[in-house]
């Protein structure tokens, strides 16, 4: 009985200190960058909750003798439900798994059209560019109201082609744009907003990795 009470107290203490860290937001546009970091450096960078870019990411996704830079749209589509390829994805991304992971999801997509505003509600969200270059517009959580998000965390604004007279709050929006090149990975912080855009009319191959820990799944707002 005493042991059970002791364990409950320990768990409560851990949760108490984890809660503010899990829900802490960093609104700065400062960017951290590192070349192929070791696990310790990687985790320390993500714990700062800033935009983080990692270069020279060693992703090996050759499948049936085809390298990612030669994946076509149709071929990429056939990989969506391919268990063998999913295993390859998981093996490549195991290194970036959050400690005490209880949820993870991978997806590979052939990117050919710019996206609308996307609200990032996962605790750890990694985006890897496998081919060419992609442009990413990033908005911190404070910009949410100015971007006309609704209660479902969605916005119907076409930001780069919007009518600023119809949506006057857009005049106050602050954001940055970055270029993510081949074999580079970005960590988009929790509750940030982003848009993916083609760069110089290039199609890209994107790999996303979503991860939640026991604590983030339980405690995040």
PLM regions and their residue ranges:
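N-terminal accessory scaffold of Fe(II)-dependent oxygenases
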Residues: 1-186, 195-221
């Amino acid at each position: 009985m005493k042991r059970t009470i002791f364990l409950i107290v320990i768990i409560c203490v851990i949760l108490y200190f984890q809660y503010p860290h899990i829900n802490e937001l960093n609104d700065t546009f400062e960017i951290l960058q590192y070349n192929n970091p070791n696990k310790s450096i990687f985790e320390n960078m993500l714990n700062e909750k800033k935009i983080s870019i990692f270069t020279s990411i060693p992703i090996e996704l050759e499948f049936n003798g085809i390298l990612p830079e030669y994946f076509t749209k149709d071929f990429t589509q056939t990989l969506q439900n391919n268990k063998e390829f999913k295993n390859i994805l998981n093996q490549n991304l195991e290194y970036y798994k959050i400690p005490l992971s209880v949820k993870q999801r991978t997806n590979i997509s052939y990117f050919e059209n710019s996206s609308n505003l996307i609200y990032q509600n996962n605790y750890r969200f990694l985006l890897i560019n496998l081919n060419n270059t992609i442009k990413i517009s990033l908005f911190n959580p404070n910009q949410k109201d100015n971007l006309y998000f609704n209660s479902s965390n969605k916005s119907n604004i076409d930001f780069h082609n919007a009518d600023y007279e119809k949506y006057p709050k857009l005049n106050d929006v602050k954001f940055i744009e970055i270029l993510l090149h081949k074999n580079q990975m970005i960590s988009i912080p929790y509750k940030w907003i982003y848009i993916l855009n083609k760069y110089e009319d290039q199609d890209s191959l994107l790999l996303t990795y979503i991860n939640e820990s026991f604590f983030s799944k339980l405690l995040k707002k």
